[in-house]
């Protein structure tokens, strides 16, 4: 078994356009490899996958809300490309074994370059809309949530499901070796973050879904959320015991106690309304979302260029209006961070600077939205360079805040902005904190040096290249493209490169 050219071509375009996940800054080196995609494809196509040993990933503790966290993983870009190609090439085998799409709503595979791996971006809303309809004919609704699902998935279960889905043996072995590389050899847990992992996680629930269907349950599911529609409270309690037994016997999974609940129809329909993402907090948010939909046609990935939006529509996204909306979310006793993150993603589509001030001023309350805030800031258009400089000053102040100092993910997210926008230039400050910074921060500071043309500073770090970790090496090789032609050629030729991604990146550096 080998990866096909079509799969590899698609994977390169996919990761370049959609990044490797929703939580981390895009790996900038992907663009360089994309320019030399034929070299990467030729190095992988037709080759034994065992030749490509999984590389070190990055793991960070990421906030879910004010008091809970999850561990998120970013795969090495080579592994992201290979895994994406594998799922593109063989993922339909998993999809064909799943229950119908109006029973299991999450992560239905239909790879396209415009939408990514999964077909329906409105699946979450449709799940709750279907739940609302089913509740009208039920006496009780049982709401179940599998506890810590991704971290509890056994690799042996993944292996069995990939076999049943027709994955070639070599592909299965590579996937399992990748999973083990992210868990320090422990045979349990899959990484949270990478797009293709969602389908692998879904594959492990196929036996659970089949068992619930065989038991005659009227249920629907989205990822680890299961809803069962019952005729009585007695039936709901009996079904609860059955599901708990199925999860335990099949995969030693458990239900999350605080989210397990039996609802009456009226109470449940209120919950359904609360769970739908597109539910504006006030009329002003509804008006802004209407403007965005008018220009994007409802496509959550389409951006609106400043030149295409009318002056009157642009003016609606004022600092006063946007700040009021965000403050209204934050004033709630139980802040709806899921909905607030969704709002920031919509703001990123239009790129209006109206949310900058409130976002930076209220970061202590907006921690669970930080990745979305940074993505929003990187999308901002039509402001003067001097304003970017002021934004950079505020970001540097945030780096000194206690809540940022104590969280690697916060620091990574903030520093990544300096490496992607030349106008935020505060490199003189960043260079002073380089030696005392963590490895991941050094990577972003090196990329910031490249962005701000601090070539002489980069040159001073050539001697430490051999001691850099994999992620720093990638960044420094990329940055070496700014050296004079003879210098970068001599530097690149001094070292060996591990794997097709590094090799192609080094060839790109010498070619420009």
Predicted features and spans:
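Short, low-order "capping/linker" segments at domain edges
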Residues: 269-283
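Generic structural microfeature
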Residues: 81, 221, 279-282
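Conserved two-metal-ion catalytic palm core of "right-hand" nucleic acid polymerases
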Residues: 1-169, 180-186, 191-194
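Conserved polymerase palm-domain catalytic core
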Residues: 118-223, 227-253, 258-262, 285-475, ...
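Extended charged low-complexity segments that act as oligomerization/scaffolding linkers
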Residues: 117, 265-270
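Long, charged low-complexity terminal regions
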Residues: 487-488, 506-512
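A general secondary-structure junction signal
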Residues: 64-66, 259, 264-266
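Alpha-helix boundary/capping detector
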Residues: 112-113, 238, 252, 269, ...
């Amino acid at each position: 078994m080998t990866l096909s050219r079509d799969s590899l071509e698609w994977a390169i375009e996919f990761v370049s356009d959609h990044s490797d996940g929703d939580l981390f800054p895009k790996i900038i080196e992907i663009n360089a490899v994309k320019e030399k995609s034929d070299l990467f494809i030729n190095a992988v196509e037709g080759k034994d996958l065992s030749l490509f040993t999984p590389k070190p990933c990055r793991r960070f503790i990421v906030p879910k809300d004010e008091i809970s966290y999850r561990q998120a993983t970013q795969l090495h870009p080579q592994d992201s490309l290979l895994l994406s190609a594998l799922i593109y090439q063989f993922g339909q085998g998993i999809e064909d074994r799943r229950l119908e799409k109006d029973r299991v709503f999450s992560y239905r595979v239909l790879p396209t370059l415009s939408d990514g791996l999964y077909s329906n971006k409105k699946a979450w809303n449709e799940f709750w809309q279907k739940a609302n309809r089913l509740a009208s004919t039920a006496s009780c609704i049982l709401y179940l949530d599998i506890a810590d699902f991704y971290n509890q998935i056994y690799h042996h279960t993944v292996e069995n499901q990939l076999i049943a889905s027709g994955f070639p043996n070599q592909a299965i072995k590579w996937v399992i070796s990748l999973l083990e590389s992210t868990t320090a050899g422990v045979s349990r847990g899959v990484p949270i973050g990478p797009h293709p992992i969602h389908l692998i996680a879904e594959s492990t629930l196929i036996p659970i879904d089949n068992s619930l269907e065989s038991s005659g349950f009227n249920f629907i599911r989205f990822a680890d959320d299961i809803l069962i529609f019952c005729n009585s409270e007695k039936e709901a309690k009996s079904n609860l015991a059955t599901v708990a037994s199925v999860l335990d016997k099949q995969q030693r999974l458990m239900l999350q106690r605080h989210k397990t609940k039996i609802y009456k129809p009226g109470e449940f329909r209120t919950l359904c309304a609360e769970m739908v993402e597109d539910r504006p907090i006030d009329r002003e948010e509804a008006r802004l979302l209407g403007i965005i939909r008018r220009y994007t046609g409802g496509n959550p990935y389409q951006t609106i260029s400043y030149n295409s939006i009318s002056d009157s529509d642009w003016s609606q996204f004022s600092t006063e209006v946007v700040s009021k909306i965000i403050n209204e979310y934050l004033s709630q006793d139980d802040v709806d961070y899921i909905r607030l993150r969704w709002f920031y993603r919509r703001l990123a589509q239009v790129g209006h600077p109206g949310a900058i001030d409130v976002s930076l001023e209220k970061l202590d309350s907006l921690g669970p939205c930080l990745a979305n805030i940074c993505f929003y800031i990187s999308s901002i258009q039509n402001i003067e360079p001097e304003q970017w400089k002021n934004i950079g000053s505020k970001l540097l102040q945030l780096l000194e805040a206690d809540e940022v100092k104590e969280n690697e993910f916060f620091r990574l997210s903030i520093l990544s902005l300096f490496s992607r926008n030349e106008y935020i230039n505060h490199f003189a400050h960043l260079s002073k904190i380089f030696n005392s910074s963590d490895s991941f921060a050094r990577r972003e500071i090196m990329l910031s040096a490249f962005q701000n043309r601090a070539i002489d500073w980069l040159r001073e770090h050539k001697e430490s290249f051999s001691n850099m970790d994999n992620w720093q090496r990638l960044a420094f090789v990329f940055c070496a493209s700014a050296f004079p032609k003879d210098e970068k050629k001599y530097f690149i030729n001094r070292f060996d490169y591990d794997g097709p991604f590094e090799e192609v990146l080094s060839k790109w550096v010498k070619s420009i």
